[in-house]
Amino acid sequence: MDFSYIGEAGYDDDQKNITLINRMGLLNIGETAVDVGANHGGYTSFFASSVGAAGNVYCAEILPFTFSHLKTRFSNHSNITLLNMAISDSNGTESIYAGSSTETVNITGFGTTIDPVCKVGEVKSIKLDTLLEHEEQIAIIKIDVEGAELKVLDGMRQIADKTKALLIECHFQEDWPKIKKILLDDFGFQCYNVGREERINQDSPMPYQCLCWREDENNSI
């Protein structure tokens, strides 16, 4: 398996994610994929390669410097739509907060005593319900938004039924019960803790990365 798509990230869980997505056939030629919180575009690159020229990839990143890198990297990719926007629960504007590294960039204002954040700018925001309302089906949405998971999920309730899979990175323990309810009950997904390699149920602890999908005989774990 070629993991060069991930490039800058290189986490073991990311490699597992790519393997699972490919093995389960969750992303195919001609389909639509979304990378929310693209950072340097590792997943965007994998998605674009998987869906081919006939497919479509939406790539959203809030940090201007990182977005500039994405524009350069994917300037010749006609199947990628680049968005310097926050994916959120409303269409409007969100504040951008950042600490000493890109890993702390978020729209929630959350920081730590070791790496506090401050407001560094503003960015336009859009709901996935709005962005994807004209798509007939979405193969997969990857969400890595440094604690704004609930905002993204609440903003995609209208398009959840036509979304086949989610890959979501979880950050705050206090948000996990709500996230778990949305994924399992509201959206009706099967969910899998990638790091622990086990199914997620109502009693499961928060995973770091969670793969969610609509199970059939062809894509069971």
Placement of each model-derived feature along the sequence:
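Phosphate/nucleotide-binding beta-alpha loop and adjacent structural elements of enzyme active sites
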Residues: 1-221
